[in-house]
């Protein structure tokens, strides 16, 4: 089983290149090693990362990357933020089944103007 921290971890130094300047939508998993619901999401996110080539999935360890957590107002975990064209378009807090997460992501992406 893959751990979230192994799921393309990003830092304050790499966030712009990996998330804000990405060519595809990016799901950012704000997570912590001590968070049981975060750990429950690890296999779901790992499977999604393996199955989907239209979505980049990265993780941010809120303990070591507090500046990013503060910048994006992360208060509960796990928090999933979907970025498209460098802009956060969805903010989802809490563990959820894969079907629900994918449905919420699809809905957020469909709400985007054409050309993004």
Language model features with spans:
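N-proximal helix/coil linker or "cap" segments that precede and/or mark the start of modular domains
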Residues: 1-6, 116
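Conserved Rossmann-like nucleotide-binding pocket used by diverse enzymes
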Residues: 6, 31, 56-58
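A short beta-strand-turn-helix
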Residues: 8-26, 66
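Short pre-active-site segment immediately N-terminal to redox-active cysteine/selenocysteine motifs
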Residues: 23-24, 30-34, 76
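Conserved helix-turn-beta segment immediately C-terminal to the redox Cys motif
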Residues: 24-25, 40-60
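Conserved redox-active cysteine motifs that mediate thiol-disulfide chemistry
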Residues: 30-44
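Structural micro-motif
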Residues: 66, 72-81
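Non-catalytic, surface beta->alpha helical segment in thiol-disulfide oxidoreductase systems
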Residues: 82-116
């Amino acid at each position: 089983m893959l751990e979230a921290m192994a799921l393309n971890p990003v830092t304050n130094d790499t966030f712009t290149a990996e998330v804000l300047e990405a060519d595809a939508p990016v799901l950012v998993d704000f997570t912590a090693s001590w968070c049981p619901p975060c750990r429950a999401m690890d296999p779901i996110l790992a499977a999604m990362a393996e199955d989907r080539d239209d979505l980049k999935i990265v993780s941010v360890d809120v303990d070591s990357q507090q500046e990013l957590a503060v910048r994006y107002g992360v208060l509960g975990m796990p928090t999933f933020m979907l970025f498209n064209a460098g802009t956060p378009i969805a903010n989802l807090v809490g563990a959820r089944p894969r079907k629900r997460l994918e449905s919420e992501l699809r809905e957020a992406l469909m709400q985007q103007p054409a050309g993004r």
